[in-house]
Amino acid sequence: MKFSFAALASAMLLTSTAAFAGIVTSSSNIDFLAIDGQKANKDLLKSTKSFNINESQTHQVVVRVSEIVRHGSDRSLYESDPIVVTFQGTNEDVVISAPKLENERDIKNFKDSPSVIVKTNSGKIIATKQEILKQEGFLPGANLIDTLSEYNASGSVASVSNFATAMPAVALGFAKAQKGKVVVQGENIAEQQLQFWFQQADKETQARFINWAKNQK
């Protein structure tokens, strides 16, 4: 009887804990760059593109909106500046979405008012605080977490002071330790950027890129 009671209590505890957790996903044109002060784990987000939230916590995600857009008869890749989005957790599943960007007018409108929508699966709009994360220097994305930590310490609109000093990556299931120092060499900016992003990618992505590059010859 004691064993049965203990098992029942454990099951109730797990059920209670799960009831207060929601899962965040995004529209196809959004990439997660950082979650609660930590760099998003590309390997995990590549397959699930989701993370957990708790209704008792304030959460913060840094996102980038990316779209292939038309410029006359040509197409090009548009990538927004990183957007910091802060919101209160919920026990419902949540979708973070951005408007579809198809042409130059859409891009201009989004640049004039860059924002995303955070909505529960039941259709409730979740209040957010949003702001562009300003970055400086060559390859600013390489210092995203440091820049975010400084932002969170600044008391800005969407800052969360608890994330000003990033926690160790092992504390979060979707985070990973920063890679070692990345060294790039090249005769121009484009070559250096290619080297940098190649070293940031996982092995599968690197292999696909190499195959693609061979086919361009």
UniProtKB/Swiss-Prot annotation:
Alphabetically list the UniProt keywords. Answer: Signal
Where does the secretion signal sit in this chain? Answer: 1-21
Question: Which is a Pfam family this sequence falls into?
Answer: DUF2057
The record's comment on protein family reads: Belongs to the UPF0319 family.
Listed name of the protein: UPF0319 protein HSM_0266
Write down the species. Answer: Histophilus somni (strain 2336)
Q: Taxonomic lineage per UniProt?
A: Bacteria, Pseudomonadati, Pseudomonadota, Gammaproteobacteria, Pasteurellales
